[in-house]
């Protein structure tokens, strides 16, 4: 029987000035959104969501992104940027923060409020939070970000 997720080959070193995009979930599925950007030996995580199981997953409550590819590099993470407060974008953040509890979190006021509630549910302490709004520009290590509004089914 073949494994549903075959082992991927090792990724070579990142060329100087190169940007690596590592999707850890949410690619080809609706849910479990998590993308890591690697640049100059630093990492930026965008979203950290869960996937809700289907009927052929009895007894499974949540499906998390695979933290394995970055687990030994969590000290290189500049921040976790949350695009909005839906569970498929923030639901796995408490599990990531159990691995490294001081990762700065960036998001809108509403998104960070929803995350705070989730952290209390998991009995985790608050981490450094940076509230951003549409039009804001910030730098996180070597990463420059600009926040733009999009139409979606959440008011933020």
Describe each PLM feature range.
Residues 17-24, 30-39, 136-156:
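Catalytic core of the metallo-beta-lactamase
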Residues 8-10, 23-24, 33, 93:
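Generic recognition of flexible, low-complexity loop/linker segments
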Residues 61-64, 87, 151-154:
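Conserved phosphate-coordination/catalytic loops
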Residues 79, 83-90, 152:
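Histidine-centered divalent metal-coordination motifs
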Residues 1-22, 38-49, 110-155:
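Metallo-beta-lactamase
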Residues 27-32, 39-82, 94-103, 107-111, ...:
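Pre-active-site segment of Zn-dependent metallo-hydrolases
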